[in-house]
Amino acid sequence: MFLIVGLGNPGEKYLNNRHNVGFQCVAEFARRHHLSFDGKRSDARIAEGLVNGQRVALARPQTFMNDSGKSVVGLVNWYKIDPASELLVVYDDLDLPFGTIKLRNQGSSGGQRGMNSIIQLLGTQKFARLRFGIGRPPEGWEVINFVLGNWNAAERETLPKLYDRAVEACELCLSDGVTKAMNAVNGEAPKKSKDQAKEPANEQPR
C-alpha cells in the first residue's frame, strides 16, 4: 500500500483556499483514476484502489491543518506502512513561488504547521513530500489571511496545468520510486506571467 495524503481544512468555506491545495491535488488524482472518497478512517476521508497495479490510498485529514499528524499517524499504523518508502504528503508551500512544484524524500516542515504536526507525531522527517508553491502574500497582508484566501483569477487559470503536474509527480512516485521521480519533477520553476504579476491576490478574508 502506498499512502498519499493531501493536507487542508475540512468544510465548504475552506474548499478553494490556497491552504487546501493538498486536498485539491489528491481530489484531482482520484478523479483521474476513478477513485471515490467514500471511506473514513483515522479522522480522514479515504479513497482506495489500484493504480497501475499498485494498491493506493488517498487521504484528506478532517482534523484541520494544524492537527494533521493525528490522522496521518493513525493511517500509517492502520495500513502498516513504512513512512520512508510508502508515504507521500502533498501541501502548500509559501517559500516556493506560485507555479513551482518540488518533490523531496525528507526534510523539515519549513514552518508549515500541518507538516510540523506530522513530523512531531511520526517522530521522523524521513518521508516524501510534494511541495506546491503558493508564493508569499502581497505587501500588507497577514500570512494567515493569504493562505486562507481563495485563488485569484490569474491563479485559477493556471491551476489545471499545475494540478496535472502534481498528479503526474504522484504517479511517478508510484511507478518509479521517489528518488527517480525527484529527478523528473524538480526542474526549473516556471516564470511568472505579466498577468499573474499584476493580478491582485483577492480581498483579505474578514
Curated annotation (Swiss-Prot):
What is catalysed by this protein? an N-acyl-L-alpha-aminoacyl-tRNA + H2O = an N-acyl-L-amino acid + a tRNA + H(+)
Query: Site positions for Stabilizes the basic form of H active site to accept a proton, renumbered to this chain?
Result: 92
Q: Where in the cell is it found?
A: Cytoplasm
Q: Which GO terms describe its biological process?
A: protein quality control for misfolded or incompletely synthesized proteins; rescue of stalled ribosome
The EC number on file is 3.1.1.29
Question: Among its keywords, does the record have tRNA-binding?
Answer: yes
**Residues the record lists as binding tRNA:** 14, 64, 66
Q: Where is the active site?
A: 19 (proton acceptor)
Region named Disordered: 185-206
* Extent of the signal sequence: none
- Ranges of compositional bias, category Basic and acidic residues: 189-206
GO cellular component: a single term: cytoplasm
Which residues are annotated as site, described as Discriminates between blocked and unblocked aminoacyl-tRNA? 9
Family classification: Belongs to the PTH family.
Instruction: Kindly give the NCBIfam families that the UniProt entry links to this protein.
Output: pth
Q: How does it assemble?
A: Monomer.
Name of protein: Peptidyl-tRNA hydrolase
Originating organism? Herpetosiphon aurantiacus (strain ATCC 23779 / DSM 785 / 114-95)
| Gene assigned in the entry | pth
